[in-house]
Design a protein with these regions (language model features):
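Proteins enriched for Cys/Gly/acidic motifs involved in redox and nucleic-acid/cofactor modification
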Residues: 1-71, 83, 113, 128, ...
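A generic short-segment signal for beta-strand/edge and adjacent turn/coil regions
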Residues: 30, 95-100, 108, 219-226
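Conserved SAM/AdoMet-binding glycine-rich loop
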Residues: 54-181
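Contiguous mid-protein beta-loop-alpha structural module that forms a pocket-lining wall or clamp
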Residues: 179, 193-196
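Anionic-ligand binding region
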Residues: 211-218
Length: 244
């Protein structure tokens, strides 16, 4: 593992804490490209964070391929020597950090303890970006995601209970193989009912060497585009409601 951080301006730095992924989502090439899940040592992360603070940078964004899996591979083993919650607590204790932001975290790895700590922390901003990909359990299973829609509902409710004004962003893929009109509308209605702030919408794109690329029931490109437009319109409404 190569410890690193980068700065794009004088106000924000991106602190990499983890790389790789052990998940087998059927649409994703990241495990092939980035390898197994592995983490920086906690002491290295803290040292990097302190170096960022010394540059008078006000915000740190935690990044990684699957940051909720932090701790796995930390010392060259498959064990979680430290947890993501350990990381969050250690960073919050550093003096001089104005804001800390979690870039994106899988819903099944976003634990109640982490949500509760962020809610009362001095440095973490009340912002969560939590990939969903589909509100249809049938499609989630075809994607080989590690949760179903009810778990996602529970995560959103837990965030809002701890931080009523929290901003919650969602990743969604439309046009995945097997996504019938019925399943898409199920996903659309699911998102309408969720107390979220914005959507990042992606039309499914076939990737070589993925299980999904050889699945049947391919959704036509024009249907993917139509569904993307619908969800982007919903995102505009969600964002307007959140900020109004």
């Amino acid at each position: 593992y190569t410890s690193s951080f980068s700065t794009n301006d004088r106000t924000r730095a991106f602190l990499k804490v983890q790389d790789g992924c052990d998940y087998k989502c059927t649409y994703c090439t990241i495990p092939l490209a980035r390898g197994i899940s592995r983490s920086d040592a906690l002491e290295n992360v803290i040292e990097n964070a302190k170096n960022i603070v010394a540059q008078d940078i006000k915000e740190i964004v935690l990044t990684g391929v699957n940051i909720g899996d932090f701790g796995k591979g930390e010392f060259g083993t498959k064990k979680h020597e430290h947890t993501f919650l350990d990381l969050v607590k250690a960073l919050d204790a550093i003096e001089g950090i104005s804001r800390i932001r979690i870039s994106s975290i899988e819903p099944n790895l976003l634990k109640d303890e982490t949500i509760a700590f962020v809610g009362q922390s001095k440095g973490f901003v009340p912002h969560f970006h939590v990939p969903l990909q589909s509100g249809s359990d049938i499609i989630l299973k075809r994607m080989r995601r590690r949760y179903l829609s009810q778990l996602y509902i529970d995560r959103v409710k837990a965030i809002k209970k701890a931080m009523p004004h929290a901003c919650i962003g969602v990743d969604v893929i439309v046009g995945f193989p097997g996504e019938t009109e019925e399943e898409f509308l199920k996903s659309y209605r699911f998102l309408v009912d969720l107390d979220i702030s914005y959507l990042h919408v992606f039309a499914y794109s076939e990737r070589p060497n993925t299980a999904a690329a050889s699945m049947g029931e391919v959704v036509p490109q024009h249907v993917r585009a139509k569904r993307s437009k619908m969800l982007r319109g919903l995102s505009v409404k969600k964002r307007h409601y959140f900020y109004s």
